[in-house]
Curated annotation (Swiss-Prot):
MF (Gene Ontology): rRNA binding; structural constituent of ribosome
GO cellular component: ribonucleoprotein complex; ribosome
Protein name: Large ribosomal subunit protein uL24
Function summary: One of two assembly initiator proteins, it binds directly to the 5'-end of the 23S rRNA, where it nucleates assembly of the 50S subunit. One of the proteins that surrounds the polypeptide exit tunnel on the outside of the subunit.
């Protein structure tokens, strides 16, 4: 998966189109990412009688498919590619500028 934890991304499709945020968590097996402040859902939490905890409604960030986000570079969306350095290490590059990410 080309998007990693800590990357700054923009949502390019869906109800939050145009929103930007940092990737909090990448889920490569599911091809999804969790982005800060994007795709917010409300989850009802059950009350716990034994612990004395009240029921509440919690707002959480739901995972969004990786095809619906693009990496941001200098405020503009870009695609990600890979190159090998002279020493053989694989690095991510920006398809827009060709620079190493």
């Amino acid at each position: 998966m080309k998007i990693k934890k800590g990357d700054e991304v923009i949502v390019i499709a869906g109800k939050d189109k145009g929103a930007t945020g940092k990737v909090k968590k990448a889920l490569p097996k599911e091809q999804r990412v969790i982005v800060e402040g994007v795709n917010l859902i409300k989850k009802h939490k059950k009350a716990n009688q034994a612990g004395g905890q009240q029921g509440e409604v919690v707002t959480l960030e739901a995972p969004i498919h990786v095809s619906n986000v693009a990496l941001l570079e200098d405020g503009r969306p870009t695609r990600v590619g890979y190159r090998f350095k002279e020493d053989g290490t694989k690095v991510r590059i920006s398809r827009r500028t060709g620079k190493e990410i």
